[in-house]
Curated annotation (Swiss-Prot):
Residues 1-25 are annotated as: Disordered. The keyword Cell inner membrane does not apply. This is Chitin biosynthesis protein CHS6. The gene is CHS6. Component of the CHS5/6 complex composed of the 4 CHAPS proteins BCH1, BCH2, BUD7, and CHS6 as well as at least CHS5 and GTP-bound ARF1. The complex interacts with the cargo protein CHS3. Its main location: Golgi. Member of the CHS5-ARF1P-binding proteins (CHAPS) which mediates export of specific cargo proteins, including chitin synthase CHS3.
């Protein structure tokens, strides 16, 4: 297939229409809340090898996380279903993962279990005495809450104290609120990070209730109230050396939720202001949250700077009086550093590079282990064209982890369980159950034909979805079955999801080598890579290489020259003494950048070559890294023409949602293309039980703002793949957005 070069798209005749309001079409009236029952009736099933082992494994996983000192988000919620095969007199179990169930008390989980049980259509050889157990981890107090729903429709709640390994706790209102906050934070972080998702996960829209605005306000209030305990929520260790008031999962969640509820920003700020008066001891947490949110939305800069100055000035005046080697002092200095980083970013965006440099220097002095401070310092030097100083700042940065410790523990457990088997683009048998296990499974799914059920079993996971919310034939009946769910640490590209033969057919070995999991940059390396690319963009690769040679003594250079570096007088020459030793990770990054630039140059000189869909995807990802935006879009679009590619689709939609700041003023993606891609992505996500879709909601919100919701909906209806099943989901999402857009100021 030839490269899909961008061309001017003919605009379709737009159907005129006014503002969209909830209820202006019959399917919209259903709303999200009416989808929940169908969602609960279309859950995956993971077959246990030994009865009850998922609960046993969960207990041991929690122990491992606690003993590691990094509980993080804790394990994802699970639902376990206990059955009895009457003929064999043998118990067997099924389970699946779930997020987004409201756990402010036992009522909603019990209702969820009731719906799940009532939807069961079991065969005669399976006993009706089904027992269901819902588990949710409270990471504030290290409690695992387990709600057991018995065959006689009674339930009991057990709180396991994972620190003491006791079960004699009585759930209090405070514990329930902690559990609810834990589940909301986990739902948001999991939904926005594909690498955290295990196959067999159902993601419910936690933000949906009978009243959209009230439900969203309730979540915002909940997260804001827990800000003083945000340091107990864990953090992403790939982005920060330690948890700070800004860098923690609670703050990440609050920012992500505000991104899909922009009309509630004023409400959030007012609520936080109220908390500063009600709880003045913790006002620094609430004020920092206000600043972080306003900085994140980038539309209320004056308000942000006002609150920032009001917060920073008194803090900076305390610096000389802070006791040394004190934990509270360290936390306060980290907070000041975080706020100064926000100020630096604001000044850089305003073009005030000199003042930004001064602020960044202060931030770095306050927190020498702050990546963000050193990163901003390097940015300031690059803007001032002081490239050698920028490289020195980069070389001085604390090296962050490539993989988060919490994620590594979680995923290693999943890999050892060996429950999931990839279909590899339909090239291998992915059904992995014994005859008895299949009999038991089909006994709990009575209405499924044997061949059709086996087709939807991936290893030991039955990925059935009979209610077909979000269904489109081209996605569900074809590529979704061939590729399976794209999730986990390998979801950065399709190398591990297509057939081995397709990978072998790629002629350019370097293209594969640069895109293996081991060669993925990670968040930390990706940020540094971006700084190096900014320098390359200004002075070219040779210019960067010359500055590197003048500034650094590379490791290989040091060992090669160690015998010859001393002059005839026994002294080390001044030229060598002036050089700094280059960190090994930075040396490796220079080599990675060189390889990518070389590959992109070769590809650009061979635009007429034909490639497979996977090759176009991998080329597109390299073009993205090397800032060839137009070529990246062309490659990724061509990949999707060859075969719908969820990875390429996600990258293209990211470019539309958050265009790179250095992108040229050219429209790389028209709205018709975006709409077509978004429909496919919504459908793919629904196929594997993602009904939360925070990223897709952001895209719909942006399209609504650009086109108007009425025109957008008409454009969606013109798409060839549109049917009733996908429109139910899209209409629910549009209705939710419309409800928020019609928010009356509180």
């Amino acid at each position: 297939m030839n490269l899909f070069w961008p061309s001017e798209t003919k605009k379709q005749n737009e159907i005129p229409g006014g503002d969209y309001t909830p209820g202006n079409s019959p399917s919209v009236q259903k709303g999200y809340q009416f989808l929940n029952r169908d969602i609960f009736k279309s859950c995956p099933r993971i077959m246990e090898r030994q009865f009850g082992e998922c609960l046993h494994n969960r207990t041991h996983l929690i122990k491992d996380l606690i003993s590691s000192g990094n509980v993080g988000l804790g394990p994802i919620e699970i639902v376990h279903m206990s059955y009895l095969n009457k003929h064999e007199k043998e118990e067997f179990g099924e389970y699946f993962y779930v997020t987004g169930i409201e756990v402010s008390g036992p009522a909603m989980p019990v209702e969820f279990l009731e719906v799940l049980k009532s939807s069961k259509r079991i065969s005669k050889n399976i006993s009706n005495n089904i027992i269901l157990t819902y588990c949710c981890f409270n990471f504030f107090s290290n409690l695992d809450i387990r709600i057991r729903y018995d065959a006689d429709d009674t339930f009991q709640t057990t709180a396991i104290d994972c620190n003491k390994e006791t079960t004699d706790l009585t759930m209090t209102e405070k514990m329930w609120e902690e559990t609810f906050a834990s589940s909301v934070i986990r739902a948001i972080i999991t939904n926005t990070n594909p690498e955290l998702k295990p196959p067999g996960l159902v993601e419910c829209p936690f933000y949906v209730g009978k009243d959209t605005i009230s439900s969203c306000k309730k979540i915002i209030e909940l997260l804001c109230r827990f800000l003083p305990r945000s340091l107990n929520c864990g953090w992403d260790s790939t982005k920060s050396m330690q948890a700070t008031i800004v860098n923690n999962y609670l703050m990440y969640s609050l920012k992500s939720f505000i991104a899909i509820t922009p009309s509630l920003v004023d409400f959030t700020i007012d609520y936080l202001k109220g908390l500063t008066k009600k709880d003045p001891i913790h006002d620094i947490y609430y004020k920092t949250a206000m600043i972080t949110i306003l900085d994140h939305i980038e539309t209320k800069e004056l308000d942000m700077i006002t609150i920032l100055n009001e917060t920073l000035d008194p803090l900076l005046s305390l610096l000389n009086d802070l006791p040394p080697r004190d934990a509270d002092s360290a936390r306060l200095m980290n907070c000041m550093s975080d706020l100064l980083n926000i100020q630096t970013n604001f000044l850089l965006n305003r073009g005030d590079y000199e003042l930004a440099l001064g602020v960044s220097n202060t931030s770095t002095e306050l927190a020498l282990d702050s990546f963000e401070s050193w990163y901003n310092l390097a940015r300031c030097h690059i803007k001032k064209e002081e490239y050698e100083k920028a490289l020195f700042a980069i070389n001085s940065m604390p090296r962050l982890r490539k993989n988060d410790g919490h994620l590594e523990t979680m995923y290693s457990r999943f890999l050892t369980s060996n429950y999931y088997k990839k279909p590899l683009n339909g090239t291998r048998e992915h059904y992995d159950l014994t005859a008895m296990e299949f009999t038991n499974l089909s006994g709990t799914l009575r209405n499924w034909k044997e061949d059709e059920l086996k087709r939807q079993i991936f290893g030991r996971i039955a990925m059935i979805n009979e209610k077909k919310i979000g269904y489109t034939k081209e996605i569900w009946d074809d590529i979704a079955i061939k590729l399976g769910p794209i999730c986990g640490p390998q979801s950065v590209n399709l190398i591990n999801y297509v057939s081995p033969q397709e990978v072998k057919n790629i002629k350019n070995i370097n293209l594969i080598a640069r895109n293996t999991i081991g060669k993925q940059l990670g968040w930390f390396s990706g940020k540094i890579y971006g700084l190096l690319m900014e320098i390359v963009n200004k002075i070219g690769w040779n210019g960067l290489l010359n500055i590197r040679t003048e500034a650094f003594m590379m490791e290989t250079e040091f060992y090669q020259a160690s015998n010859n570096i001393i002059d005839e007088n026994g002294h080390i020459p001044m030229e060598s003494r002036k050089k700094r030793f280059c960190e090994g990770w930075l040396d490796d990054l220079f080599l990675d950048l060189y390889q990518d630039l070389k590959l992109s140059k070769i590809s650009l000189s061979n635009k007429d070559e034909k490639h497979s869909g996977l090759e176009w995807e991998l080329l597109g990802l390299i073009m993205l890294r090397t800032w060839h935006w137009e070529d990246a879009v062309a490659c990724l679009r061509t990949s999707i023409v060859a075969r719908f590619d969820p990875v390429s689709c996600q990258q293209l939609l990211k470019i539309y949602l958050q265009p790179p700041k250095n992108i040229q003023e050219v429209t790389l993606l028209d709205t018709d293309t975006i709409i077509s891609l978004l429909i496919k992505k919504i459908s793919y996500d629904c196929r594997y039980y993602n009904y939360c879709q925070i990223f897709n909601l952001q895209l719909l919100e942006k399209l609504c703002n650009e086109l108007g919701t009425h025109i957008l909906r008409n454009k969606i209806l013109l798409q060839p793949s549109i049917g009733d099943e996908i429109m139910v989901m899209i209409d629910a999402m549009l209705a939710w957005i419309a409800d928020l857009d019609h928010t009356v100021q509180p």
